[in-house]
UniProtKB/Swiss-Prot annotation:
PROSITE patterns assigned to the protein according to its UniProt record, in alphabetical order: SECA (PS01312), SECA_MOTOR_DEAD (PS51196)
Domain of life of the organism encoding this protein: Bacteria
Role: Part of the Sec protein translocase complex. Interacts with the SecYEG preprotein conducting channel. Has a central role in coupling the hydrolysis of ATP to the transfer of proteins into and across the cell membrane, serving as an ATP-driven molecular motor driving the stepwise translocation of polypeptide chains across the membrane.
Mode of membrane association: Peripheral membrane protein
Positions with biased composition (Basic residues): 972-984
The protein's name: Protein translocase subunit SecA
Length: 984
């Protein structure tokens, strides 16, 4: 009670935070008129002065990196707003500046859909870009990385900052002006998109200087090397690509191969919930072929097809696990003619059988994956998008390939891996944006140390969120969805329907084309009453309604389908989903990142109109572009008013997701920036969530109430049951992610040690000192191990002599000493002399340093690869320790530490042994050794694949093989060289 009173008096923590930031926004606003009075040239010069001040003043630079809001940060934010007005005709709202300040401070800004997150990121990106330490803007797909970099490019370029883009197809781009000479002129002549002295929040279309807008267009130009994108002040790319580049850098054999030259300074993660939570169970993995025969999966598949569910094996859908029953074990043993399936020699076979059961009974085609061109492609359950190149781990993908009768790709061995959780913790400052983060605030704080600040909307939110309609069967649910779409489509109201799978997506699409079903619905009395009532409310005559109804019944309901199979036109479909009469069916959050504007997007429409006239939008003249844009503005404004009168966009969800956040994201597609809109979920008791978590109680209630077919139930008890089910699943998933993080953090410490050592070797730090350090360590360890007694009289020196001979390749005299310390020191000095002789034999200190580097790097890489493989196996079996009353995590930490210590000792020993015994006559031979090692390394990388493998039962990434990428890179370089020659 007292807490509630205190909140009323002093406000919630979030309200206090927003209030604190408003003071800074007022300071930014005070600079607006002053900056507006400056010419373009003066503004550009001011930006350059500020850039120099931030990057050269070390103390100020550090304060900016830490996220302090200094007077320079205020000035940079004001400059960004002014640059956006002059180049794009967009002005940051106050709430967008608050969002930007939250990002600058290294927090998460929760901003509702349509509040302009893309523009919000520009202010913190510019001020942190001015430190010259690098800013990474992380998007969920390649298209958004390219689009956002190009769209916001004019702001950055105007203020003197360079922008790079990395894509998963291996291509790298730099943002450049389309016509640099024109821009130069426009800056000289003070040409602006937003007129001088105009201080309203939004610029009406008739006041936009369209010629100026076209002048400030940017384009993406391909760069020769990926490093170029990272050398820029700001780099756009996907989470996968930033992560894979980090791993590739740590597989590099020379300094020149490293691309992330600025390290990890500051990252702004767009759709932060999707990347840091939904994909947190996804380790990014670079792997090479492993020696496992794929024939075993064919045997397993043949066996599983003869087994019966519930008799021979059990399936737990909630926990996604499978087990053989006693009867099943005997049946398998009989079929395969073996005595004991659980014998150690059959462990791979047992594993393949269990994975095959999971492939057949837990993973469905067109829900969890699709088959295209003889390949099994994973579908992201959160977005409904195909994840090209990603493969399930642990043989599951191979089991599904056999099930579907497509070629089986061999299993892989890990070369390098990291989870997104640990990758993003590399950044000195991390920030993120999303429309829905509050429900996961605890996880953001606990795992990443990030606070969530909910940013107020620019205009009050007036969307109506209706209670769920719950039907007994899926069939009744789908009929009601079709009825809702039909009713609203007749009046021209745009409808967006969200489905959870491609299968549902395509099912609904066929129902909307089913004229027989549409007629049946149209003839129902309940539908006729609703139609009449809606027409009356909207003032539409019965004749008009009848005419439109007949038209729809004749042709079916025209609609756009958006799923993993039809992703090419994603942005275009979503951008026009708010037009009059538009019906869009999308899997979950497909199209996320593109706003649904009521009436449609004028710029997309203008491009479409030019294409219809046979004109390429990129090559259109200023006059053609201006004319198309004016017409597009007129059409969209007209349609916007009509859609508003109809109640705005209607969003229909067809199934509750495991996470409330995903449901909220779908609802959030309607009612952007104060627009009207409605949302409703139409669900059934046969949907997975209710079926697995508490649908029985609701089903009994429906039987008790004698609910007839086609009648929904609306009750608080049902809503509560759904919410409780979601909370249980969310808590379960959080624990899984937390556990994964705890396990990966053990490896993270080890990875850090190995990668730091690798980087030192590549950057040419004194390897010789490292070798001397190794020598001292090995001598100390061996003396203590082989001479356990303290008294020299009791020492048996033969084992030590044998070891020293094995190490150096020659007899080493053991000196007379008083104690172990003296022995260690004298042996160290003696072995150093032998090592110096070897150096003279090699030819020169420089040649020896290079040999040290190549040998240590090679041995370290081999040992780390084997260590990762050992850790994978350790992790698989560690959970069994729980049955013995031991904590698997503590056991894993202990054993992983011992394994790592042994690995490092072996690296030291093998490096010394190789260097002492190497037989090389000249420096040329050293270069040859180095060249051979590089070739071997290159072959390994060419065969490697990039994967994001999501634990046992899940999915995720591997864009193209590096072999393909390297080939493309070589081709691209040739083309660029040829182009340059032509120009010369």
């Amino acid at each position: 009670m007292l807490g509630w009173i205190a909140k009323k008096i002093i406000g919630t923590k979030n309200e206090r935070e927003v209030k604190r930031l408003r003071k800074f926004v007022n300071q930014i606003n005070e600079l607006e008129k002053e900056l507006d009075a400056l010419t373009n040239k003066e503004l550009v010069e001011l930006a350059q002065e500020l850039h120099d001040k931030i990057r050269f003043d070390e103390e100020l630079k550090e304060r900016v990196i830490k996220g302090e809001i200094t007077p320079e940060v205020i000035k940079a934010f004001a400059l960004v707003r002014e640059a956006a007005k002059r180049t794009l005709g967009l002005r940051h709202f106050d709430v967008q500046l608050i969002g930007g300040l939250v990002l600058h401070e290294g927090k998460i800004a929760e901003m509702k859909t349509g509040e302009g997150k893309t523009l919000v990121a520009t202010s913190p990106a510019v001020v942190n870009g001015m430190t010259d330490e690098g800013v990474h803007i992380v998007t969920v797909n390649d298209y958004l990385a390219r689009r956002d970099a190009q769209w916001m490019g004019p702001i950055y370029k105007f203020l003197g900052l360079e922008v790079g883009v990395i894509n998963s197809d291996g291509k790298t781009y730099l943002v450049e002006w389309v016509d640099p000479e024109k821009v130069k002129e426009a800056i000289e002549n003070d040409v602006r998109v937003w007129p001088k002295g105009y201080y309203e929040e939004i610029l009406p279309s008739e006041k936009v200087n369209i010629d100026a807008k076209k002048t400030y267009f940017t384009t993406l130009k391909e760069a020769e090397h990926r490093r170029k994108a990272y050398e820029a002040h700001i780099t756009y790319g996907t989470n996968n690509e930033f992560g894979f580049d980090y791993l590739r850098d740590n597989l590099a054999f020379s300094k020149e191969e490293i691309v992330q030259v600025k390290g990890h300074n500051y990252a702004i993660v767009d759709e932060v919930d999707s990347i840091l939570i939904d994909e947190a169970r996804t380790p990014l993995i670079i792997s090479g072929p492993a020696q496992i025969d794929s024939q075993i999966y064919h045997v397993a598949d043949a066996v599983v097809r003869k087994l019966k569910k519930d008799k021979d094996f059990t399936v737990d859908e909630k926990n996604r696990t499978v087990n053989l029953t006693e009867q099943g074990i005997k049946k398998v043993e009989k079929m395969l003619g073996i005595d004991n399936l659980y014998d150690l020699k059959h462990v791979d076979l047992l594993h393949a059988i269990l994975q095959s059961i999971r492939a057949h009974h837990l993973f469905k085609k067109d829900v969890h994956y699709i088959v295209r061109d003889g390949e099994v492609l994973i579908v992201d359950e959160f977005t409904g998008r195909v994840l090209p190149g990603r493969r399930w781990s642990d043989g599951l993908h191979q089991a599904i390939e056999v099930k579907e009768g497509v070629p089986v790709k061999e299993e892989n061995q890990t070369l390098a891996s990291i989870t997104f959780q640990n990758y993003f913790k590399l950044y000195r400052k991390l920030a993120g944006m999303t429309g829905t983060a509050e429900t996961e605030a605890l996880e953001f704080k606990e795992i990443y140390g990030l606070d969530v600040v909910v940013i107020p909307t620019h205009k009050p939110m007036i969307r109506k969120d209706h209670p769920d309609l719950v039907f007994k069967t899926k069939e009744e649910k789908w009929e009601r969805v079709v009825e809702e779409v039909l009713l609203n489509h007749i009046f021209g109201r745009p409808v967006l329907v969200g489905t959870v799978s491609i299968e549902d997506n395509e099912k609904l699409s066929s129902l909307l084309k089913n004229k027989k079903l549409l007629k049946e619905i149209a003839n129902r009395n309940s539908f006729k009453r609703r139609l009449e009532e809606t027409a009356k409310n909207l003032g539409v005559s019965p004749e008009e309604v009848q005419k439109k109804l007949e038209e729809v019944l004749k042709k079916g309901i025209p609609h756009n389908v958006l799923n993993a199979k039809h992703h090419e036109r994603e942005a275009e479909i979503i951008a026009q989903a708010g037009r009059v009469g538009a019906v869009t069916i999308a899997t979950n959050m497909a199209g996320r990142g593109t706003d649904i504007l009521l009436g449609g997007n004028p710029e997309y429409l203008a491009k479409q109109m030019l294409k219809e006239k046979g004109i390429n939008p990129e090559e259109a003249t200023e006059e053609q572009f201006r004319e198309a844009l004016r017409e597009a503005y007129r059409i969209t404004e007209e349609e916007k008013e009509k859609v508003k009168k109809l109640g705005g966009l209607l969003v229909i969800g067809t199934e509750r997701h495991e996470s409330r956040r995903i449901d909220n994201q779908l609802r959030g597609r309607a009612g952007r920036q104060g627009d009207p809109g409605e949302s409703r979920f139409i669900v059934s008791l046969e949907d997975d969530l209710l079926r697995l978590f508490g649908g029985e109680r609701v089903s009994k209630l429906m039987d008790m109430l004698k609910i007839e077919r086609g009648e929904p139930i609306e009750s608080r008890m049902v809503s509560k049951a759904l919410e409780n089910a979601q909370k249980r699943v969310e808590a379960q998933n959080f624990q899984i992610r937390k556990r994964l993080y705890e396990f990966d953090s053990v490896m993270n410490i080890q990875r850090d040690v190995v990668y730091t050592l690798r980087r030192q070797l590549l950057e040419g730090e004194n390897v010789h000192e490292k070798i001397k350090e190794f020598l001292k360590d090995i001598i100390t360890q061996k003396v203590n191990e082989l001479l356990p007694e303290d008294d020299p009289e009791l020492w048996d020196l033969e084992p030590l002599k044998a070891f020293l001979k094995e190490l150096t390749g020659r007899e080493v005299e053991i000196p007379q000493v008083r104690d172990k310390e003296e022995l260690i020191q004298k042996l160290y000095e003696e072995l150093l002399k032998i090592y110096e002789e070897k150096e003279k034999e090699i030819g020169s200190p420089e040649a020896m340093r290079e040999l040290e580097r190549v040998i240590l790097l090679n041995l370290l890489d081999n040992a780390w690869r084997e260590h990762l493989h050992t850790l994978d196996r350790l992790r698989e079996g560690i959970y069994l320790r729980g049955y013995a009353g031991k904590d698997p995590l503590i056991e894993y930490k202990r054993e992983a530490y011992e394994l790592f210590e042994n690995m490092m000792e072996n690296v030291k020993l093998n490096t010394l042994m190789t260097l002492f015994n190497v037989q090389i006559k000249s420096e040329e031979e050293i270069k040859e050794v180095e060249h051979e090692e590089e070739k071997k390394h290159q072959r390994l990388l060419e065969e490697a694949e990039l994967q994001g493998v999501q634990g046992k039962s899940d999915k995720k990434p591997r864009p193209k093989t590096l072999k393909e990428r390297l080939k493309e890179e070589r081709l691209r370089k040739r083309k660029l060289k040829a182009k340059k020659k032509e120009q010369e």
